[in-house]
Amino acid sequence: MVAVPFVKLKVLSPILTAMSHSMTRGLRTLAHHERIAFGAWLVTWISTPIVLWTAGEHIFPWMASLGVLTQVALSVGILARTWAPFQLASVAGKILISAWAIEVVGVHTGLLFGRYAYSDVLQPQLGSVPWLIPFAWLMMLPPAWAVAAAILSDDRPEGVQRRSHLLARAILAGAAFTAWDTFLDPQMVARGLWQWATPGEYLGIPLRNFAGWWFAATLLTAVVQPKNVPRMPLLLVYTLTCILQAIGLGIFWGQPVAALCGTITMGSFALMAWIRESRRWKYSSGP
């Protein structure tokens, strides 16, 4: 009875060790200004439960907004390594406008995600959609792009990669982005930030919602066609988002099922990406 977990641990140990080493390298690659943004983001996430306990639950929208904006600053700052300012502004603008339009259509028609509505907790709103929501798309799409790039990269120059390969990366990025929603939706519904007209199959969330997220994120990625994405630091952001969400939902917010499901879905993408990245680093560094 004891041997089975021991064998599993023995198999997973080198994988987790390689993953931790890769994450450490990812942290070391952060520039000075990126480390400031990283620190601000991490402090915001870690301090949120403490602030809510001391100041009250009414502070949550402010802490959520601060968490989103600090992660946007971090993700966009990392992209600025390899992207020209105009390209960065153009892509960010496309994501913000497209995400807002998708949400407006979703709220008013029920297409893509099913029938849902935002409460008045998050303000201000435009077209019944809180202004913060498009920024949440912007904060997590780049890390999802890094996951797809790490898993599927064939190390050829991105300009000569086949269209089928770019499409596969868009599909995988959409799935990695959707995995984050297995954490997000149960938490925000429980806090009354939005609600569904008819409770669905996954902790009250319709499965159709996740299909809509995957389709929308895949479409956005295919349109933007992000290239030269700094993989390792954005993988670090994706992985830490998974870890922090798992701890938050599992320990502080009393949602262990969402914590487990999110860890499995989002963690699987992170693990696959880090395995590929660690192998790539090992082969490039030689014996």
Question: Model-flagged regions — what are they?
Answer:
Residues 1-18:
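N-terminal amphipathic/basic-hydrophobic helices that include classical n-h-c signal peptides
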